[in-house]
Amino acid sequence: MKLPAAAGDAIVIGPNAVRLIKSWGEQLCEEIEPHLSNATHAEMLDHHDRFIVRHELAGRGKGWFTNRGRLISILYEHARKLGIDIRLGSRVTKYWEEDGRAGVIVNDRERLAADCVICADGVHSAARAWLTGQVDTQQHSGWANFRAHMTTEQLAKDPEASWVLQGTREKDRVYVWFGDGINLAIMTMKRGQELAWALMHTDKFNAHESWAGGRASIDDALATLSPWPGRLRPSSVIRHTLPEKLVDHALIYRPPLDTWVSAGGRVMLIGDAAHPYFPVVGQGGSQAIEDGVVVATALELAGKENVPLALRIRATLTEENNVLMEAGNSRYPRATVIQLGSSTLQEHLFWPDWEAVAKDPSVFAFPNPEWILGHDCREYTHQVFDTVVRAVRGEGEYIPRNIPADGAYRVEDTYSPE
């Protein structure tokens, strides 16, 4: 089974995760870099297509913006070169945890056992239901997001649409339009060779929470923009989208879980399975990468011989059988603050206070929080590992230093790249 290299639309990887990927090797980064957008700013416009302000993108040029499928394909090939056993098309049909081991049943037939199981099975996680014993607590937000990716050959030939490629041979462009309950972003990549767009709207078309597609219509996307007096320019671009490349993705809110770690301490949720975000916060992929690195670092610090074998996390605790609990405890506050913040930011941007915007266009500025973008989760895990282990054993207190002191997410401009 081969991954489709250009599947999906686009993904943002923040500087906090880019630093981690860069640590995996120079050759890997050389493969990724030709596919990135080199845009550094975005033009903010209203629904009349009137210019509001030009803002610097989140990450101050240290983050990545690229095609989702291509990035995943490159990372997949990198993992294969490392000799990692990846089995595409293998469906996990059951999870188990018993007698000092944990594992999965694949395709209702093959039983696999391991020291621990890390579950990264996304927003529809079967592992989450097994681990928590809860039915999915999803709540439809009422929002959906048309999303698409395209190459730009046809745009260049269309006099009405070619405006979006002006200047992109030197610098990619980002345009963001705001209207009441509607938000549109158009972003070029690879010096104008590719383009992605995303149209946030109230869900009137029975959108699905799936990247595999479902019913999505270009006509519906264009109709969503029909009330805008300034729809001509963005519509000229959207209409070139191939139907098979369009997704209308429902935005589903899921409240934070009580825990990501199983009672036996051998099974853990990470990524969207643990803490799904709204895309507006631009940290979904980055926080998933942080999850993986923190778990790997915690396992490395404990050593294979110290991964829990018989004792349960909630029984007599020692450092050995706290390794996944340590990873969960150090990650949970940080990921949860960002998860809750994504909901707040969603409302803030999609029902703008136009009087406030007229007085201060910075209300549309991209979040640039130092505590998110400047964070080195690997170094932090080394620093707090022993403290968190002692806290789990009841021998002290762990006070997170990777979130704001009051635990509140704010739109702030505090990030200073190294």
Swiss-Prot record:
**What Enzyme Commission number(s) does the record list for this chain?**
1.-.-.-
Explain what induces or represses this protein's expression.
Expression is positively regulated by brlA, a conidiation-specific transcription factor involved in the early stage of asexual development and necessary for conidiophore formation. Expression is also induced by the cell wall integrity (CWI) signaling pathway that includes the mitogen-activated protein kinase mpkA and the transcription factor rlmA. Expression is negatively regulated by the transcription factor sebA.
Where in the cell does this protein reside? Cytoplasm
Please name the InterPro entries in this protein's record. Answer: FAD-bd (IPR002938), FAD-dep_Monooxygenase_BioMet (IPR050493), FAD/NAD-bd_sf (IPR036188)
| Key words of the record | Cytoplasm, FAD, Flavoprotein, Monooxygenase, Oxidoreductase
Give the residues the record marks as binding FAD: V12, R68, D272, G285
Q: Name one GO biological process term.
A: fumiquinazoline C biosynthetic process
Q: In what pathway does it function?
A: Alkaloid biosynthesis
In the UniProt record for this chain, what is stated about the effect of gene disruption?
Abolishes the production of fumiquinazoline A and C and shows a 19-fold accumulation in fumiquinazoline F production.
MF-aspect GO terms: FAD binding; monooxygenase activity
GO-annotated cellular components: cytoplasm
- List the residue ranges forming a coiled coil, or say none: none
- Please report any disulfide bonds recorded for this protein chain, giving both cysteine positions: none
Annotated catalytic residues: R147
> Sorted alphabetically, which Pfam families does this protein's record hold?
FAD_binding_3
What does the sequence similarity comment in the record state about its family?
A: Belongs to the paxM FAD-dependent monooxygenase family.
Q: What does this protein do?
A: FAD-dependent monooxygenase; part of the gene cluster that mediates the biosynthesis of the antitumor fumiquinazolines that confer a dual-usage capability to defend against phagocytes in the environment and animal hosts. The simplest member is fumiquinazoline F (FQF) with a 6-6-6 tricyclic core derived from anthranilic acid (Ant), tryptophan (Trp), and alanine (Ala). The trimodular NRPS fmqA is responsible for FQF formation.
User: What name has this protein been given in UniProt?
Assistant: FAD-dependent monooxygenase fmqB
